Design a protein with these regions (language model features):
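Alpha-helical transmembrane segments of multi-pass membrane proteins
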Residues: 32-33, 77-96, 147-154, 175-199, ...
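Helix-loop-helix
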Residues: 57-59, 63, 69-72, 162-176, ...
Length: 383
């Protein structure tokens, strides 16, 4: 298996999407609830904008009854938000567990069809990692991925539409920063993905080494090879530590980049928004709304960034799962093959030869014999 060169994200997602098929209704309802959780955040800036502008322009119109009604409206939105968030937290995770279970079942069934040559060339520890721990992260990935990106896109579009209605120039100025942020973050994201791939591969190597040592524990002790095994494990363990340090270096750079853009966007809102307000292009309440929408956007981007590690873990798990599923069995039924019936029990070898893959010579060479039903035949090697 080639784990050095990663698969393209588009190919991985294409192979993963069919697993949502059985849970399509659950996913749609989950995304609907995700949309409901954005209501409070998107409406609050408009409420504060209205109260601020009314207070500065016509304070008498801002009655106690009006403020209470606005407060009750926002309270209802928060209740809806809480109920929707509960559904997402429970049902979304359960859907993820179902998908993880389906993938593990498919991987196990596929492994049963693979020939001995696959198992001869692949460490059992690597296989175990691929069908167990590698798929754990798929549970989180499978529901958080559509939720987080759907929420981010929805908030971005709605915020842009609302702010464009207030002042298009200032809105375009602020939103021009987002593509630059995305390009910068994507580069670091790819580096993090490559590092996670190395981590998973090294974990598989460690699992394989632990399994070999424990299964052959009696032999190790018989030859007093404990120091050798400890040194081998220590070397692999230290290599894993180096890979993790490398990963966290990229993750730290990733987070610092986003924090820098956070500061730049706030500076832009303060300076540009202040100048627009001085020139009478926006009201004080509008500046409050701009600041809050920018905060909402940055909070959403931070959530995507925090999810980035989980996203890369999930993608790496899917990639390693797909590497198993892409292995073609050496022995397959011909097209239109029929089940064997009316078996009489007679076995006949007609000039049969056999060699293990990559072996230099045949272990069975041009054998011809016939074993009748009930007869016992032994093939004894000649030395």
């Amino acid at each position: 298996m080639n784990t050095k060169k990663g698969m393209k994200a588009a190919k991985l997602l294409k192979s993963f999407l069919p697993y949502y098929g059985k849970y399509k209704k659950v996913l749609i309802l989950d995304l609907f609830c995700a949309a409901l959780t954005t209501l409070g955040e998107l409406v609050l800036p408009l409420i504060l904008r209205f109260i601020t502008n009314q207070g500065m322009q016509d304070l008498a119109s801002l009655t106690t009854g009006l403020v209470v009604k606005i407060g009750l409206l926002y309270l209802i939105l928060r209740v809806i938000d809480s109920l929707a968030a509960y559904y997402m937290a429970y049902t979304g995770h359960v859907m993820g567990v179902y998908i993880e279970t389906d993938m593990r079942q498919d991987a196990f069934e596929h492994l049963q069809m693979l020939s001995d040559s696959y198992y001869s060339n692949t460490k059992v520890g690597q296989i175990m990692s691929r069908i167990t721990s590698d798929l754990f992260d798929v549970t989180e990935f499978s529901h958080h991925c559509p939720e987080e990106f759907f929420i981010a896109i929805l908030k971005g579009i709605v915020s842009f539409v609302i702010l464009s209605g207030i002042n298009l120039e200032l809105t375009l100025l602020i939103f021009l920063m987002i593509p630059i942020m995305i390009v910068s973050c994507t580069w670091f994201n790819l580096k993090v993905k490559a590092a996670f791939r190395l981590q998973r591969n090294q974990i598989g190597e460690l699992n394989a080494q632990i399994e070999d040592t424990l299964l052959g524990n009696r032999v190790v002790r018989a030859f007093a090879n404990e120091p050798v095994e400890i040194e081998k494990f220590g070397k692999g363990n230290r290599e894993f530590m180096k890979i993790k340090k490398h990963t966290y270096r990229y993750m730290a750079a990733f987070q610092i980049t986003t924090r820098s853009f956070d500061g730049l966007m706030y500076v832009l809102v303060i300076v540009a928004g202040g100048l627009f307000m001085i020139n009478g292009k926006i009201a004080p309440g509008d500046l409050v709304a701009y600041t809050m929408y920018v905060t909402t956007l940055l909070t959403t981007i931070r959530r995507i960034i925090e999810f980035a590690e989980q996203f890369q873990r999930g993608m790496t798990g899917i990639e390693r799962f797909q590497e198993i599923m892409d292995v073609t069995p050496d022995i397959r039924d011909k097209k239109g093959a029929k089940p064997l019936s009316d078996v009489k029990g007679t076995i006949e070898f007609d000039h049969v030869s056999f060699a293990y893959p990559e072996a230099g010579e045949n272990v069975i060479n041009d054998i011809t014999f016939k074993a009748e039903k009930g007869q016992t035949v032994a093939i004894i090697p000649r030395y």
